[in-house]
């Protein structure tokens, strides 16, 4: 299949592109390039790509593709709070516009990278895809809005699937240090402490970036009649853990001491997720990597590739990177690339 992969120079896209290529797909990327040089270790080999702001994509850019995998977004809650209106502009309006243009261009399948954050404050019970949604951040709200708008676009000729990823972890050449496991491991190696700013009680489902990539690859080739219009949680119940439990895993792999301060106050985002629909609809997608696997992988990568405090707190933190691009006049207040 000919695949357009948006966000191919991001954390997930850099892992996903080679997985898709190994499965025999012809991959073209689309990325604005904010994080292209945010690399730890050897530079990845990117697929051919279009350097375009998501808000400026045209139908002509999408012609000839069999499927679009849409990863590109302002990718976490702190970025959403930085500029909520821009979060909605990019994550919601531009994403739905992309889907409409893809349908207009004759693309048959649209895989949307959603999030388990749509469940928000769900408590201790397992939540499945038909649960009431309770997003608590602009990032999560934007994802819910896109899912609803995709429902209106879905028909016999345009198969949309919203894949609700658990919180990602694991090494990517274009690393992120602002997601929970990656952050805790890095801080532990740099300081000797596993620092948890919440009280440690919120539940989080975690999933390795490579497992996410394999799920998307499976969704590409699944029967359209089986997956059309579906919302599918991406992860495994084995990785439903509290933040304190994640910290204990990191301590075991690094030898660092756990320190739970609670200074950030109560985090309303807490949810345990049911992944049985994934196993039923995409049985070939084997989510298999544990949190301990990811912690060991990250420890080795951080040590082998020379992680430093400056890299950890700036290059690989999305909010810090956006601010750096703005302060150096490479992007403007609307997050558009400066001429």
Per-region residue spans from a language model:
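C-terminal substrate-binding subdomain of Rossmann-fold SDR/epimerase-dehydratase oxidoreductases
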Residues: 197-339
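SDR active-site strand-loop-helix element
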Residues: 6, 30, 68-71, 110-116, ...
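N-terminal Rossmann/SDR dinucleotide-binding element
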Residues: 1-67
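Conserved catalytic-core motifs of eukaryotic protein kinase domains, centered on the activation segment
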Residues: 39-41, 78-85, 121-125, 173-174
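NAD(P)-dependent short-chain dehydrogenase/reductase
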Residues: 148-204, 209-218, 249-250
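Active-site helix of classical SDR
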Residues: 142
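NAD(P)H-binding glycine-rich loop region in Rossmannoid oxidoreductase-like domains
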Residues: 54-90
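Conserved Rossmann-fold NAD(P)-dependent oxidoreductase catalytic core, especially the SDR/UDP-sugar
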Residues: 96-138
């Amino acid at each position: 299949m000919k695949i357009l992969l948006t966000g191919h120079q991001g954390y997930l896209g850099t892992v996903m592109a080679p997985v898709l290529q190994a499965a025999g797909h012809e991959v073209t990327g689309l990325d604005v390039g904010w994080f292209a040089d945010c690399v730890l270790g050897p530079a990845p080999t990117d697929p051919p790509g279009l350097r375009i702001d998501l808000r400026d994509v045209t139908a002509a850019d999408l012609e000839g593709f069999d499927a679009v995998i849409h990863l590109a977004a302002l990718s976490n809650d702190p970025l959403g709070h930085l500029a909520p209106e821009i979060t909605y502009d990019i994550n919601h309006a531009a994403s739905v516009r992309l889907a409409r243009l893809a349908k207009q261009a004759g693309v048959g399948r649209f895989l949307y990278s959603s999030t388990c954050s749509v469940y928000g404050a769900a408590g201790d019970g397992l939540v499945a895809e038909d649960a009431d949604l309770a997003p608590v951040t602009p990032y999560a709200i934007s994802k819910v809005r896109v899912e609803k708008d995709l429902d209106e676009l879905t028909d016999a000729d345009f198969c949309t699937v919203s894949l609700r990823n658990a919180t990602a972890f694991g090494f990517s050449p274009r690393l992120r240090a602002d997601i929970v496991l990656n952050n805790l491991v890095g801080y532990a190696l740099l300081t000797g402490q596993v620092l948890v700013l919440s009280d440690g009680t919120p539940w989080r489902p975690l999933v390795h970036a490579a497992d996410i990539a394999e799920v998307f690859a499976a969704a590409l080739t699944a029967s359209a009649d089986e997956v059309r219009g579906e919302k599918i949680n991406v992860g495994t119940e084995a990785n439903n853990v509290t933040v304190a439990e994640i910290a204990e895993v990191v301590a075991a792999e690094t030898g660092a001491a756990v320190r739970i301060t609670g200074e950030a106050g109560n985090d309303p985002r807490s949810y345990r997720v049911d992944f049985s629909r994934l196993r039923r609809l995409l049985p070939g997608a084997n989510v298999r990597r544990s949190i301990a696997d990811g912690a060991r992988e990250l420890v080795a990568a951080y040590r082998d590739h020379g992680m430093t405090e400056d890299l950890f707190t700036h290059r690989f933190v999305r909010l810090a990177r956006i601010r750096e691009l703005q302060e150096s006049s490479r992007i403007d207040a609307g997050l558009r690339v400066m001429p």
